[in-house]
Every structure is written in structure tokens, then in C-alpha cells.
Amino acid sequence: MTNKLKNYFPMIRQKDELLEEIKKQPKLRAIYESWDLERREEFLNFCTGVRGIKILYDSFFKEVMNPEYVPERLENFLCEVLRRKVKIVRILPNDSTRIADEVSLLITDIVVELEDGSLANVEIQKIGYSFPGARSACYGADMLLRQYKRVRAKQGESFSYNDIKNVFLIVIYEKSPKELHQFPDIYYHHSRQTFDSGLKLDMLQEFIMIPLDIFRSKMHNKTIKTVFEAWLTFLSEDDPEKVIQLIERYPEFKPMYETLYQMCQNTERVMELFSEELRQLDRNTVKYMIEQQQQELDKQAEIIGQQKQELSQKDEQLSQMEERLKKQAKEMEELRRQLG
């Protein structure tokens, strides 16, 4: 496997060479030894080409898709996702009102302004949030409100609602929530608001959800046939055979891998970035487990509440039946007295 990728990327280093550098420098050795065996193997594998690089790690994604230095890459990706021509004008600060727990569950979150004034937010989640619809709707509304405040402050008295442009929330899931698995053959979900009467109004918010786990399952043993499939393969695959298939069929992706393998030449930097990814991954996992446990507790509390209500209703029914029996017993006693 190593030789196959090295044929395409000669800068890929040998395992012995990399380990020798790590052992010679106390700082690097300390970082390396702080990882468990699985993480050490993962690091060595992607640095030496045994596996491809995991593009979805935040540091790696931002290195290869940085809209400030190489905007054309993110532009090309957005063209495929939005299915329209895209030109990035500037990167916007992500000053949304997300709560801290939500921020910690994200891999990547980039907001850009497009040439027509619309906003696109690319959000990558390693583990899909619960309630993806409600969360997306709230964040989409927040994006729209932020744009409204910014434009109104800039335009002043000349402000017009016509100056408010579309906002696109693009959510890419490495592991998608259960709602998306109700559609096991679909890995592109697009939503915009419409009226059932046929009234045509642009409500400005559009949502796109891309479950990469479903894409990988769907593409198993299949050939990449479209640029969109090529992008999703780039984001989701670290299998060397898939990487080679991708760059042979779509050579425009090769420079992106070269960017990352060049980054791997700086061992100290890439080790520090990888360590930060691992820390974030651990936090993500803890947050996810807490959220799942809370959902289970809420569900159990709801069941207990329903059972209590049912028992209360049964107690009331028994009490009413007891009253009826007492009343019938009195009536029978009265009848006996009349007969006697």
C-alpha cells in the first residue's frame, strides 16, 4: 500500500525514517508516547501512505480547503453542492449564538459570503446531532438574522429587504443521525420552504444535508462517475486504492493531497495538529455519550410519567367501581328490609 501512494506522491516518508526523527527529539517522542497504540498506528499510517489522510480532521480540512489562500477549492466544492456557479468574496467570522456544547461537537464550521451577497455555511459534524431538523432551522434563522443586522447597520435609512440574500446551511455528516438512515440510498438532501398553494416567494433559507457514511455504503465497489461523487470520495475515503482511483479519474484532486503530504514533512507541526484532533475527538465522544444518555433518561422519564398517569386513571376507575358496589350493597340491604 505504501509504495502505491508513494508512486503518486514521492514526498511520502518511510516509516523507519519518521520514527527515527521522532525518537531523536524529546518533545516529539513525548507527544508520540502520550498516544495509545491505535493512535500511533493511525498517525504513522497516514504519514507514510499506508492509509490516506483523513480530510475531515479540522486542521487538515482547513489546510487544503482554506478559502483565504485557495478559495477556488471551496468554490468548486460549493458549485457541486449548491448546483450553481459560486464565487467567494470573503470569509465571515462565525459569531453565532451556538451554545458551547454544540461548538465542541463540530469538526469544522466555515462561513463565507458569495458574489451575489448570499451566505454559505459549511459545517462538518463527526457525530450527527440529535434533532437535526430543529437545530438546522434555528441556526439557519440565526444566520439570516445576523445578515439582516449587518446589512441594516451598513445601509441605514436606505435599507431594503431586497438587500437580504439567501443563506445556505450545508451540513456534512461523517456519522449521520438516525433520521437520515430512513433513506439508505440517498446521500444528498436539499430543502427550501415552499407554499402548498403554489405561491412563489423566496423565503431565503436553504438546507443541504450530506451523510458521508451513507455515501460510502452506497458507493461500495462502485466507480466514481461524477465530480460530486469525487468530492465526497475525497472527503470520506482514506483507502489508498480509492485515493488512487480518484486522482487518476479526477487529477484536479492530486494537488490537494500534495498540500497535505507537504504538511506532513513538518513532523512537529503535524503531530501537534493530530494531538489537538484527538483531544477534540475525545471531547466530542464524551458530549455525544452525555447527550445520548440524557435522551434515554428523558425517554424513561416520559414512560414512567405515562405509567403513573395510567395507574392514576386505574386507581380512579377502581375507586368509582368501589363506590358503585357500596351503593348497590346499600340498595340490596334496603330491599331486604322491605321484604322482611
Model-derived features with residue positions:
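Selected N-terminal structured segments and early membrane-anchoring regions
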Residues: 158-161, 167-168, 215, 260, ...
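Accessory alpha/beta interaction modules
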Residues: 1-206
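Short, charged alpha-helical interaction segments and adjacent helix-coil junctions
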Residues: 2-51, 120-125, 233-340
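Charged, alpha-helix-enriched surfaces in structured cytosolic catalytic cores
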Residues: 69, 73, 131, 226, ...
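Short hinge/gating elements
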Residues: 57-65, 155, 212-218, 242-246, ...
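Extended serine/threonine-enriched, polar tracts that run as long, contiguous segments within proteins
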Residues: 196-229
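Short conserved micro-motifs at the rims of enzyme active sites and ligand-binding pockets
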Residues: 181-183, 219-223, 272-273
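Short acidic (Asp/Glu) and glycine-rich catalytic loops that position anionic groups and cofactors
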Residues: 54-56, 207-212, 234-239
